[in-house]
Amino acid sequence: MVSKEAIAAARAAYDIEAQCITEMKDYFDDEQFAKAVELLSSAPRIGTAGCGHSGIICQHMAHLMCCIERPARFISPAEAVHGATGFLQPGDVMIFASRGGKTKELLPIVDICKAKGVSIITVTENMESPLAQAADVVLKQHVNRETDKWNAQGTTSTTALCMIFHALQAAVIEQTGYRAEQFALIHPGGAVGERLNNKAL
């Protein structure tokens, strides 16, 4: 039988993450966010990179951009220093996600981006970190605490990162005038595709 403590921990997780999203609005920087939206709306290509949980959410961000026809791909930090950064060209944008802002695997990619004329957007909690200092745009990843009792698992921090990426996509949709009809063409599958293509919006 599942313990009362286990159920209590599960319920507390909802409260912790809901509180985090509410608090994040206090850290929303209109100027920095607007710069990020402008870059993402005009860049020929978008790269994303992160390690661990941040890397997984960066894969999600690349897909979010592709879903509104902003060409994007996740660039594995392991592959980035073995030629994968050839995807990036002058005028492109690279998004780095690192809660601490010091992820060593990402730092060589920064140097490549700088040399190639690629703009950098960094999402981090540490605004004084190397990745933040190297960026053209920095977005604050506020985290109240992780949901596990040790405050160590990548839980609330991934929710915070997702929230920022979701907000960016919503803004880019508005900025570029992307239409439901365009999305319907590239998303014919599933319930979403059926709804869009039947124009039951």
Give the ranges of each region predicted by the language model.
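Glycine-rich phosphate-binding loops that contact phosphosugars or nucleotide phosphates
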Residues: 45-51, 55-176
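Conserved active-site and cofactor/substrate-binding residues in soluble primary-metabolism enzymes
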Residues: 12, 16, 28-31, 35, ...
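Internal, active-site/partner-interface "lid" segment
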Residues: 133, 147, 173-201
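An N-terminal, well-structured beta->alpha segment
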Residues: 2-42
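Alpha-helix boundary/capping residues
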Residues: 40-43, 95, 190
